[in-house]
Amino acid sequence: MESLALYERSAASSYLKNLVRRLFGRFYWVTYSSALSYKGLWKNGLFEGHGELKYSNGTKFSGTFSNGLKHGKGILVSSSGYRYEGDWVKGKKTGFASIRYKNGDGFEGEVKDGLRHGTGQLHDALSKLSFKGSWHKDIIRGDVNISSAHWCFEGPMPNSDGLTRGEMRYSDSSIYLGNLKDFIHHGAGSLRSSSGDCIDGIWVDNLNVHKATKKDKHGVYWKGNLRNLKPQGYMHVKLPNGQEYDGLWENGSMLRALSVKNRTGQVSPYHMH
């Protein structure tokens, strides 16, 4: 783009030296071979103020110029679908801008030399995800905010294996804090569900938890494994009144009680009747 900007500047200068200045000395339309055409203001033989550029490849620019270069606010639209609306500095895309890429992605934020650089938000058309954070030469770095239609993540950008640790907020008001893989619960973490349940443990995915501790909205305390977020296998249960018991569970239903501890701490085996 720098070489093109220099071309625009030199082309305008050489042509205008021989141009009969007319039309109030302010507006003109001029075509430089098949490369580009310009309509707008000029000063001292160079593009100056507001003008419009049209390129032979279909690209169009409308905005302000200074000393023959794009400078200030402007909109660049290409025939491929790329659209840039924002700041320009000495012919370069630098400042704040709104960009639509030809693949459908969109970006709003700070740019430098045409690259995402600074604070900004990228909307990915394919995944339907939105990435908000700090950018360096088109790459997002540090802590990010990633959101979809159903959840929002805050934490470090996932590595090449999709692993990270952070906070997930869901549309049903559930909140998860812990390890993730591809934005699925994976490893140590805790969940506070919209129903009031609090679950800590080693997560296999969003529904299955090993070595789990769970306290439900009624104050019942569970310790064991969860499948589909329901008690599965051997579980230790403590009731709000202090009574405790051990049992075997299947898909959230108790198959049998193994032992019972009363409020005085005495433990006795539970006999099936």
Regions picked out by a protein language model, each given a short descriptive name:
Residues 1-273:
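Glycine/tyrosine- and acidic-biased, solvent-exposed loop/turn segments at the edges of beta-strands
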